[in-house]
């Protein structure tokens, strides 16, 4: 499954993996998964976190390593039921629920994920996605960016 990913995708997933793997030991624990999900405004129970880990934990050691993470991401990308997931992700970014992601909202989410971005980097991300040039990202623009990945 993961062998169908491009070099770019793999390096992006490596970056995402390291956001979860807070202590850098190469494994994502339920605690680390919980930290990231809570920073995104979710509130999973310990049992839900354990279920999520178990779902992808191929070797049964109770954590997710990078190959397992890659398989999960490859499966998610193939999953055509991504419309609902995209809406959910958009809502995470769109803090005030006005239908747009502003630079401030983007910065807020990225900071919560542990990504310290300069104003220039945030503006650049907005510009890349902002097709109609209004300085923010609407849902259609968000979908385009997410599907291009």
From Swiss-Prot:
What are the record keywords, sorted?
A: Acetylation, Calcium, Metal-binding, Methylation, Repeat
Signal peptide stretch: none
Q: Which InterPro entries match?
A: CALM/Myosin/TropC-like, EF-hand-dom_pair, EF_Hand_1_Ca_BS, EF_hand_dom
Q: Annotated Gene Ontology MF terms?
A: calcium ion binding
Record PTM N6,N6,N6-trimethyllysine, positions in chain: 116
- Which residues, renumbered to this chain, carry the PTM N-acetylalanine? 2
List ligand-binding residues for Ca(2+) 2: 57, 59, 61, 63, 68
| Repeat as UniProt keyword | yes
Record: residues binding Ca(2+) 3: 94, 96, 98, 105
One family from Pfam that matches here is EF-hand_7
Record: residues binding Ca(2+) 1: 21, 23, 25, 27, 32
By sequence similarity, the record places it as follows: Belongs to the calmodulin family.
Sum up the protein's function in the record's words.
Calmodulin mediates the control of a large number of enzymes, ion channels and other proteins by Ca(2+). Among the enzymes to be stimulated by the calmodulin-Ca(2+) complex are a number of protein kinases and phosphatases.
Q: What is this protein called?
A: Calmodulin
Origin species, per record, is Helianthus annuus
Q: What gene is it encoded by?
A: CAM
